[in-house]
Amino acid sequence: MCELKELERELQPRQHLWYFEYYTGNNVGLFMKMNRVIYSGQSDIQRIDIFENPDLGVVFALDGITMTTEKDEFMYHEMLAHVPMFLHPNPKKVLIIGGGDGGTLREVLKHDSVEKAILCEVDGLVIEAARKYLKQTSCGFDDPRAEIVIANGAEYVRKFKNEFDVIIIDSTDPTAGQGGHLFTEEFYQACYDALKEDGVFSAETEDPFYDIGWFKLAYKRISKVFPITKVYLGFMTTYPSGMWSYTFASKGIDPIKDFDPEKVRKFNKELKYYNEEVHVASFALPNFVKKELGLM
């Protein structure tokens, strides 16, 4: 494993160092100016880069794919975490697979009902880097309710049966690192088995525009396992297309019929993106998405 070392480098005003991320087919992409390189290293699994952008703040990337930026990470983390958390009647035990930056854990821990939240991250160096450089998202690491496990999530979840109220999959891109292991039908079945009867599940399932293949495959596989499977969407400005998909699933809870907006209105923790109106609206899908999923 690569040791975590200081790699800060101030760039001179005339130095134009840019970060490029290419989307599907390498014909479209994202580029960001780097005014400070904070960390760059290679673990046994993936390349880790952390740098500063004048407008977006600290940017975190794995294998050349943007994971978080300080300015917009709340959009992704709130939608991934709070949709399932508010749908469960009393979430006490939560498993997060992936999400080594800590943002999803931070949001889960905003719920006072939570007694234990396990964050299972495959790459220990990501946890070290997040703890040191991603203060905004890793602030929940030392919460007494949090437990950090370094393990392959696809293998770890198989240890449990009827154990969790909520399982959240905060995976990397399926083509990077070991992210593909978290997109298999066998993995989704293991998550189903690890949930209690009233348990709920959510997963990031890529963008429904450039990554349409992975998006459709995830929905197809999840819906084979869970009797209730619904896609919902949210904005994510630095992810491909700006439109991001998530998939909610459960053994019996419906994300619209069983949603209680009053629980959200009474919530006394800060939410910058998610609210009761956004919850309902996020499940309204554009026609092109419905068509790809065979829903029209």
UniProtKB/Swiss-Prot annotation:
Its EC number is 2.5.1.16. It catalyses: S-adenosyl 3-(methylsulfanyl)propylamine + putrescine = S-methyl-5'-thioadenosine + spermidine + H(+). It comes from Thermotoga neapolitana (strain ATCC 49049 / DSM 4359 / NBRC 107923 / NS-E). One of its GO terms (biological process) is spermidine biosynthetic process. Homodimer or homotetramer. Pathway: Amine and polyamine biosynthesis; spermidine biosynthesis; spermidine from putrescine: step 1/1. PANTHER family: SPERMIDINE SYNTHASE, SPERMIDINE/SPERMINE SYNTHASE. GO terms for molecular function: spermidine synthase activity. Spermidine binds at residues 77, 101, 170-173. NCBIfam families: MFS_SpdSyn, PRK00811.1, speE. Belongs to the spermidine/spermine synthase family. The active site is at residue 170. This is Polyamine aminopropyltransferase. HAMAP family: Spermidine_synth. CDD domains: AdoMet_MTases. S-methyl-5'-thioadenosine binds at residues 46, 121, 152-153. It is an enzyme of class 2 (transferase). Residues 16-251 form the PABS domain. One of its GO terms (cellular component) is cytosol. Catalyzes the irreversible transfer of a propylamine group from the amino donor S-adenosylmethioninamine (decarboxy-AdoMet) to putrescine (1,4-diaminobutane) to yield spermidine. Pfam families: Spermine_synt_N, Spermine_synth. Its main location: cytoplasm. Keywords: Cytoplasm, Polyamine biosynthesis, Spermidine biosynthesis, Transferase. It is found in: Cytoplasm.
